[in-house]
């Protein structure tokens, strides 16, 4: 904070630290502003809407400014140096009154309009003429927020689904839409209500109505025919049905099927495959989309992918790329032999499996296709139109699919030098007819690798054949379903296993880096406030053979079923990431480095946004598991012994959590640089030496204190339901290193 006497009169400070004259009080003010965004879908009778915020970016954050604000007599100084904060996500508990929200503190940034406007929408206008987002009316260095998420709307049996992007310039625009200043000591609240994608549609249709330049995205509209699906980053498929009458009508009009592909931030033209193919691919990779016809069965259920045919093998003549398949339909429009299906409404049809490759590029650095890179997508339609800037597409699609990116918490700036691992996004097991559904898995991995889950998967495959794995009560088969029989020989061999079940050590990495990954990819995507013993829990399978259950709702808790309660019912499969390589058979680098001689651990391969890099020393304030207080220090030293050594004294769990126990008061010669670890730091200490933290406590409390209190370790990570059960224990102190 900063402050000054507004009158300019002399201020006398007494030896007691008080101001001699009450008329000349120094009034302090915050040098930053507080900005809050709430985002929700509009409610309307007869329409079902949902919006889920994926990430938010804060652009043009001022890097410098005055200590004292722009008071009378001071010249207005506009920020020249700015930077960006990209790819932020919100937590599972960041919901109030049904709306998602986030709050940030931003430095003052005073900026002047470029051109006057008369509406909120015009503030975000970029005239749609630039390949990059360059605003026409807003100042070039004005602070703005980019909201990215998924919108879905159902009305009268027709569903629209959109990956949308909203741009919101900050400033008090309620009093003046030309106002872009972010002033210190002010609170700004922006309530965003997503009421539809119509403005995006207007852009795409190029109608003479006012478009909404602050909103962009891909808009799909599908109704009685066809479907749109979101698929995960592993190997996927979707069965599509094509009607003979449709291609015959297109052919009469001198056209064929339209398609468009989005990948790696670029997209093809809207390509028409008829007598000739029109439209450019623009160097966009389309090889990840393939078709096969034999024994495919389409499902009318819009949430069901259908029954795929067997993958014929990458070198099989039965496999088509996009253009050759659509050309095949065009060329055989009148050939009744291929249109083997029939229904009474639409006539003859052909069912084909669209095989989607894993979202992995062996010819690129892995940072080029993970996390918040634009998702890749594929659309097949009779009619497609795009906005003039190419940023929005409106398609009355017959079929459309969007594929998630692999999510990782590893430092993407080191993609050229380290092998990482990433995870899928969707919990495929929820609501699916796996044998583990309801009862959970009784299966323990046959592997004994505590780090590399793929090594354990290979041991499991060695023990059981594929047929037995499909029928037993395990989640191994769930991970096998993420892989593909690439050579078409009828089995998934060792060199075809790309996706595997994590070890506990790998789950800990995902927990440490939760903030880095998308909102949808978080292992626990519900609220902890409603947790009960049996409800709202999300239990994941681990390939660590003595800890096969990971409790995602508790952040870091484990057990071993069936020797303990709670069988795992979900699994979040992993994929190893290595630049310019297929990478699947490389062991991922550990995300931490431990110096044995110095007893120091450094999270040197974790994205720094997941870490506490401040280097601040001393005890932590009270905090919960998903708050900033539970970010682990990037580097810290682990004490050689615990206190008290005999689990006696005042180190109860409650006293540690609420700060009555302090490391500097009891340990290491009163050095105030030592402190109690938070929960994530204690998880890292488990990776180094589990025995060191046996019956040890941490500073972090659980966000639902009525459900669980805090954490400890007794052969597995566990949580207390009552303080009295943990009246004595110990603490392994740490010292943060800069």
Task: Show which residues each predicted segment covers.
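Active-site microenvironments of metalloenzymes and redox enzymes
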Residues: 383-484, 576-670
């Amino acid at each position: 904070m900063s402050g000054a006497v507004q009158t300019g009169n002399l201020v006398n400070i007494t030896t007691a630290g008080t101001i001699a004259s009450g008329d000349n009080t120094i009034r302090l003010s915050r040098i930053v502003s507080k900005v809050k965004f709430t985002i929700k879908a509009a409610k309307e009778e007869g329409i079902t809407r949902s919006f889920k915020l994926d990430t938010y970016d804060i652009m043009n954050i001022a890097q410098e400014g005055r200590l004292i604000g722009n008071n009378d007599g001071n010249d207005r100084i506009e920020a020249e140096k700015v930077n960006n904060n990209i790819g932020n996500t919100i937590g599972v508990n960041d919901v109030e009154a049904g709306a998602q929200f986030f709050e940030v503190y931003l430095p003052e940034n005073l900026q002047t309009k470029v051109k006057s406007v008369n509406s909120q929408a015009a503030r975000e206008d970029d005239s749609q003429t630039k390949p990059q987002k360059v605003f026409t009316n807003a100042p070039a260095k004005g602070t703005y927020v980019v909201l990215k998420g998924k919108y879905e709307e159902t009305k009268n049996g027709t569903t629209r689904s959109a990956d949308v992007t909203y741009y919101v310039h900050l400033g008090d625009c309620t009093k003046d839409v030309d106002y872009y200043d972010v002033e210190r000591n002010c609170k700004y609240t922006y309530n965003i209500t997503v009421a539809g994608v119509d403005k995006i549609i207007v852009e795409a249709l190029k109608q003479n109505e006012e478009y909404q330049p602050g909103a962009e995205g891909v808009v799909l509209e599908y109704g009685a025919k066809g479907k749109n699906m979101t698929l995960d980053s592993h190997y996927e498929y979707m069965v599509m049905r094509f009607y003979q009458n449709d291609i015959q009508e297109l052919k009469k009009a001198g056209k064929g099927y339209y398609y468009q592909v989005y990948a790696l931030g670029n997209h093809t033209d809207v390509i028409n495959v008829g007598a000739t193919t029109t439209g450019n691919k623009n160097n966009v990779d389309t090889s990840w989309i393939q078709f096969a016809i034999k024994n495919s069965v389409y499902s009318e259920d819009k949430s069901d992918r259908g029954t795929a045919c067997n993958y014929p093998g990458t070198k099989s003549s039965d496999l088509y790329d996009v253009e050759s398949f659509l050309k095949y339909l065009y060329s055989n429009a009148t050939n009744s032999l291929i249109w083997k299906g029939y229904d009474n409404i639409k006539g003859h049809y052909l069912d084909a499996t669209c095989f989607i490759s894993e979202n992995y590029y062996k010819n690129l650095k892995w940072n080029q296709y993970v996390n918040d890179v634009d998702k890749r997508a594929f659309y097949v339609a009779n009619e497609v139109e795009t906005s003039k800037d190419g940023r929005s597409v409106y398609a009355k699609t017959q079929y459309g699919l969007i594929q998630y990116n692999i999510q990782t918490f590893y430092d993407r700036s080191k993609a050229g030098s380290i092998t990482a691992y990433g995870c899928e996004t969707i919990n495929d097991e929820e609501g699916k007819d796996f044998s583990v559904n309801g009862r959970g898995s009784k299966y323990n991995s046959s592997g004994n690798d505590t780090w590399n889950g793929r090594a354990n998967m290979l041991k499991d495959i060695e023990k059981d054949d594929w047929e037995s794995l499909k029928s037993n009560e395990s989640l191994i088969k769930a991970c096998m379903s993420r892989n593909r029989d690439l050579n078409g020989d009828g089995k998934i061999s060792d060199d075809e296993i790309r996706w595997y079940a994590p070890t506990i050590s790998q789950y800990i990495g995902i927990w440490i880096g939760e903030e880095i990954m998308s909102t949808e990819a978080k292992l626990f995507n519900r609220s902890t406030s409603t947790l009960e013993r049996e409800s709202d829990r999300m239990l994941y399978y681990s390939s660590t053979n003595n800890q096969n259950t990971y409790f995602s709702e508790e952040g870091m808790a484990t057990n071993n079923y069936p020797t303990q309660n709670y069988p795992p019912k979900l699994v979040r499969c992993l994929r190893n990431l290595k630049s310019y390589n297929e990478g699947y058979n490389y062991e991922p680098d550990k995300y931490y480095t431990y110096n044995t001689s110095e007893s120091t651990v450094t999270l040197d391969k974790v994205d720094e946004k997941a870490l506490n890099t401040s280097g601040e020393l001393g005890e932590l304030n009270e905090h919960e598991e998903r708050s900033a207080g539970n970010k682990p220090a990037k580097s810290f030293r682990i004490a050689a012994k615990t206190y008290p050594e005999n689990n006696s004294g005042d180190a109860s769990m409650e006293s540690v959590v609420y700060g009555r126990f302090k490391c500097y008061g009891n340990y290491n010669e009163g050095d105030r640089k030592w402190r109690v670890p938070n929960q994530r730091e204690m998880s890292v200490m488990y990776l180094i030496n589990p025995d060191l933290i046996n019956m040890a406590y941490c500073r972090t409390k659980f966000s639902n204190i009525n459900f669980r209190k805090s954490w400890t370790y007794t052969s597995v990570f566990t949580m207390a339901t009552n303080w009295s059960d943990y009246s004595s224990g110990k603490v392994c102190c740490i010292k943060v290193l800069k």
